[in-house]
């Protein structure tokens, strides 16, 4: 019996894995953490709980995107703009 | 408004990579180094896509000049929301000497061919830091230019551009067609997510050769030497105030 949310979870994992390629501490570090986080919840069967966990994953995606943007923005600002006094 | 916007995107060494100069001082090491889209080009793409989402323009075309690998950069632009791409094939020796003037000529020729009414570019690339392509493109086309844009808005048949200048902002109104170059604060570029990159593979990338556009890409510039920036001198620790004052006097600061 395959869970109808199985595809959703795989999609989330793939998207996070892709985002991890740019992680400041390295891809390997990120992948390890990602796997641990997913494995921790591998026995969850309640659809409602799975949906909650997926929502949390989607939130993490948003956070990572914001982190990468800010990191880049700060680097550009430091390189190309005079420090404000 | 049913205009077409041309956006130039450049593939550069990723901003987070530590740049290494080749031992023979002819350039920087690019083999096996992570590349990505120039951050200012991302801002340019985002602005064009936003204009499209507001239905102020009809189509966003992403252009890049270089070898096969620049298609990845074009693909990123397509994932961000550009409609189609144009890959101008320049490789080998020509790519090594490809500078702002050559790219400007290509962009100007493409703008005419595609009947674009607006060109949006990044203000400069983080690899050569030339900050010339937008200005030269405008000059070659004899179009008005809005450089260092931090805000962009259509007003009737004109374009209002707020520019970042020393110590403040300058607001100008320019006629279309025009060339705009994006500064850092223009917008927040969206992330090219994996699903969007996949979807972007279905979008078309046309291949063009500079010769097809009637552009000569030979350069008259010669790079004599590329050097690392000077390393910062180490500081010294002082024990007492007297020591500090003494050292400052020695250095002629007080």
Swiss-Prot record, chain A:
InterPro entries according to UniProt: Complex1_LYR_dom (IPR008011), Complex1_LYR_ETFRF1_LYRM5 (IPR045296), ETFRF1 (IPR052000)
GO terms under biological process: negative regulation of oxidative phosphorylation; respiratory electron transport chain
GO cellular component, one term: mitochondrion
Taxonomic superkingdom: Eukaryota
Family named by the database record: Belongs to the complex I LYR family.
Listed PANTHER family: ELECTRON TRANSFER FLAVOPROTEIN REGULATORY FACTOR 1, GROWTH HORMONE-INDUCIBLE SOLUBLE PROTEIN-RELATED
Name of the molecule in the record: LYR motif-containing protein 5A
Name of encoding gene: lyrm5a
